[in-house]
From Swiss-Prot:
One cellular component (GO) term of this entry: viral capsid
Gene: A454L
Record has Disulfide bond as a keyword: yes
Predominant localisation class: virion
Induction: Expressed in the early-late phase of the viral replicative cycle.
Cellular compartments annotated: Virion
Presence of keyword Transferase: no
Main function: One of the minor capsid proteins that constitute a network internal to the major capsid proteins and outside the lipid membrane. The minor capsid proteins glue and stabilize the capsomers.
Domain of life according to the entry: Viruses
Subunit structure of this chain's protein: Interacts with the major capsid protein.
This protein's name: Minor capsid protein P10
């Protein structure tokens, strides 16, 4: 009985649809306004007004042609494709952080290049238009520091020198880092804690977190770079080292440029001045918050 009622309802629905649609499908067209005279609108435009409009259009056309000629004959903006570096010592400076190479001045972090014409060029090592800073490990430059632990400057406090963008992929958040199974080295369990260690057995800390994947290192962001595992240890919970902490007095003669009794930013090569704001933060804990 229930099936019969359902079939009846379906047939009734289909029949209703067919009846309503047949009115439009099979009905003959009806003309409701046949035989009605065309409506005439009084248009009163004299020939004089039309002539004025045509004259104004011609005048505007000539002005546009003149502007186009001026644009074509204008000199092109100079292309600054070869940056001129006036930087003392051996600091590695990233030019073309946005894919735009420009003239580099002595006051690089504070220069205002707005309005300066630049030419877009492809810079080797760029990822998504940003080239991260290349870090100099002073242990490579000075063998006396080869066995010394070295700290990174905190990019959240001091910024990334030489990169003018708000976000540098060298210090991306964890969710923005490409996923990979690469490991710095095998995980080592020590007293129930499991952390990643580098080739020398030192724990790698960056941005206050233990680095557990090779892709979290700044060098991973640089194209064609070797993903080394011997980055210096960086800890946010310990004060920066002093010269006396790293070498004994007999080796002071080899430390050209490193001042005695002063805390160090060991990523700044010897003989290169540390930016004043960073120096104040290192020595006195002063930051511009």
């Amino acid at each position: 009985m229930m099936n019969f009622i359902l079939v009846l309802l379906i047939v009734a629905m289909i029949g209703t649809i067919l009846v309503s649609e047949s009115k439009y499908l099979f009905s003959k067209p009806v003309c409701k306004n046949c035989g009605v005279k065309a409506v005439t609108l009084p248009v009163d435009i004299s020939a004089g007004k039309l002539a004025k409009v045509a004259e104004a259009v011609k005048k505007q056309t000539e002005e546009i042609k003149t502007l186009l000629k001026q644009k074509q004959s204008a000199p092109k903006a100079p292309e600054l494709t070869n940056p001129i570096e006036h930087i003392k010592a051996s600091t590695t400076v990233v030019s073309g952080a946005n894919g735009l190479e420009n003239v580099i001045d002595e006051d690089l972090p504070f220069s205002d290049f707005k309005g300066v014409p630049v030419a877009e060029t492809t810079v080797e090592g760029m990822i998504k238009g940003i080239r991260p800073p290349t870090y100099a490990d002073p242990r490579v430059m000075n063998p006396a520091l080869a066995a010394a632990p070295v700290q990174f400057s905190d990019p959240t406090q001091f910024g990334t020198f030489g990169v003018t963008d708000d976000v540098s992929p060298a210090f991306s958040t964890e969710d923005k880092i490409p996923k990979t199974n690469a490991k710095i080295s095998s995980d080592i369990s020590v007293e129930g804690y499991e952390n990643s260690y580098d080739a020398n057995g030192a724990r790698l800390v960056m941005d206050g977190k233990v680095v557990k994947s090779e892709c979290q290192l700044p060098s991973y962001q640089i194209r064609n770079s070797k993903h080394h595992t011997q980055l210096p240890m960086r800890s946010l919970n310990e004060p920066p080292p002093m010269v006396e902490d790293l070498v004994d007095e007999s080796l002071f003669e080899g430390l050209q440029g490193y001042p005695v009794d002063e805390k160090l930013d060991l990523l700044t090569p010897p003989g290169t001045a540390t930016p004043s704001s960073e120096w104040a933060a290192i020595n006195y804990g002063l930051t511009n918050n």
